[in-house]
């Protein structure tokens, strides 16, 4: 049985580094000022950001996007100076790039990462560069921060995950359970990722979502895809999510997740019919609609999917960092929430997310799990009993093995187009 340990007990080879011990970290951004609600009254975009319940603190920062060409970065997280080491970098078709990295302790922050380096999802960052802008998710000691453009500036947002919207509408439990052809031949005690697969996703953002975000929406979408792929790598899923296309729509949102998702999915109802032409042209297996509805984080068309139902809607502010983008695609692959939240055993008794809630200390949860009783960070991992975080298995074979579900169904979805 393959067993991997991550976090403080981890030892993983970090790729893409050739950093001398004497190297200097490049400053990614410098603080300008913490923005108060009173000072944001004259700027609607800032006012909306500060009014978002999950926004704890907003700080204007001065960004040097060119710093992401370097293997080490340093910056200040609301008064605390930190340094990060690059694990890999990816080039984007539009000329941009994605920088993946890990935070290091002060004792090794200026040394090259080796096989003894830590690989901790609670101390990691992913940054998308587009021209002079940076859009990224930063987790330090489990706490989520977002770096993003807003108008002609950049802001660092400290996020209070306990105040994020509910994951789904109340009628989530009435979603159809859609049988899928699967490949459930990996044993319960095994951790095989099976044959690699690629799922292509078409992302459509409403104009309302683009306006409300006020940043570079395409970069946010690229960040969502990058985070999803990192989660698949972290959990040994053997799956790559590929951005087939991104476009916007002038569709006027109804204010109801179920209605908007139905209209997105419909091929001849007169609302967003053209996206199905785009789907075919781009050979997208899955479609995701980004909307400006803060009532919930997202909604999938079912637990499991067919080629005609592989659609989901996501509130833009939950898509990254909180991993709702990957979460909803997980539902389309038949993944369910943690067993305490969702006791259904269909289609897989083991197909649930996982929460770790110790009597004392900090807990955590995987991508498909609802929040802990005392609130806990959502880590970019799928439940998997064969992977441990700080010595704690991230699932169990009987009720919490989302990795196995994704491996079962990935080939089916990858063949939708």
Swiss-Prot record:
Pfam families: Reprolysin_5 (PF13688). Its cofactor is Zn(2+). Transmembrane segments: none annotated. It catalyses: Cleavage of Xaa-|-Asp, Xaa-|-Glu and Xaa-|-cysteic acid bonds. One of its GO terms (biological process) is proteolysis. Its EC number is 3.4.24.33. Keywords: Hydrolase, Metal-binding, Metalloprotease, Protease, Signal, Zinc. One of its GO terms (molecular function) is metallopeptidase activity. Residues 1-25 form the signal peptide. The active site is at residue 328. Zn(2+) binds at residues 327, 331, 337. It comes from the Bacteria. Binds 1 zinc ion per subunit. Metalloprotease, specifically cleaves on the N-terminal side of aspartyl, glutamyl and cysteic acid residues. Belongs to the peptidase M72 family. This is Peptidyl-Asp metalloendopeptidase. It comes from Stenotrophomonas maltophilia (strain K279a). The lineage of its organism: Bacteria, Pseudomonadati, Pseudomonadota, Gammaproteobacteria, Lysobacterales.
């Amino acid at each position: 049985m393959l067993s991997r340990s991550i976090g403080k007990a981890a030892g993983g080879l970090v790729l893409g580094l050739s950093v001398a011990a004497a190297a200097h970290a490049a400053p990614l951004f410098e603080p300008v000022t913490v923005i108060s609600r009173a000072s944001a009254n004259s700027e609607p975009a800032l006012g909306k950001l500060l009014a978002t319940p999950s926004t704890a603190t907003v700080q204007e920062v001065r960004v040097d996007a060119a710093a992401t060409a370097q293997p080490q970065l340093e910056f200040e997280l609301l008064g605390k100076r930190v340094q990060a080491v690059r694990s890999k970098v990816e080039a984007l078709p539009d000329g941009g790039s994605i920088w993946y990295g890990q935070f290091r302790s002060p004792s090794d922050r200026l040394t090259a990462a080796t096989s003894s380096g830590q690989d901790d999802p609670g101390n990691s960052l992913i940054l998308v560069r587009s021209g002079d802008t940076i859009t990224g998710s930063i987790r330090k000691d489990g706490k989520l921060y977002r770096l993003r453009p807003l108008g002609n500036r950049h802001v660092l947002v400290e996020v209070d995950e306990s105040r994020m919207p509910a994951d789904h509408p109340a009628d989530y439990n009435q979603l159809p359970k859609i049988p899928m052809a699967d490949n459930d031949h990996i044993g319960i005690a095994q951790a095989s990722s099976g044959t690699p697969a690629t799922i292509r996703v078409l992302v459509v953002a409403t104009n309302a979502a683009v306006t409300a975000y006020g940043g570079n929406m395409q970069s946010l979408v690229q960040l969502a895809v990058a985070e999803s792929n990192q989660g698949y790598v972290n959990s040994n899923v053997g799956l790559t999510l590929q951005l087939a296309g991104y476009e916007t729509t002038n569709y006027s949102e109804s204010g109801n997740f179920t209605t908007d998702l139905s209209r997105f999915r419909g091929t001849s109802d007169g609302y967003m019919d053209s996206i199905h032409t785009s789907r075919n042209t781009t050979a997208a297996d899955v479609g995701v609609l980004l909307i400006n509805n803060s009532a919930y984080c997202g909604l999938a068309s079912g637990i499991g999917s067919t080629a005609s139902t592989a659609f989901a809607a996501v509130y833009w502010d939950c898509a990254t960092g909180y991993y709702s983008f990957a979460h909803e695609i997980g539902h389309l692959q038949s993944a369910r929430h943690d067993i305490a939240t969702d006791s259904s055993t269909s289609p897989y008794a083991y197909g649930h997310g996982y929460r770790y809630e110790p009597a004392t200390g900090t807990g955590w949860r995987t991508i498909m799990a609802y929040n802990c009783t005392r609130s806990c960070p959502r880590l970019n991992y799928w439940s998997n009993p064969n992977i441990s975080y700080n010595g704690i298995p991230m699932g169990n074979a009987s009720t919490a093995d989302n990795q196995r579900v994704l491996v079962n169904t990935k080939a089916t979805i990858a063949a939708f187009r």
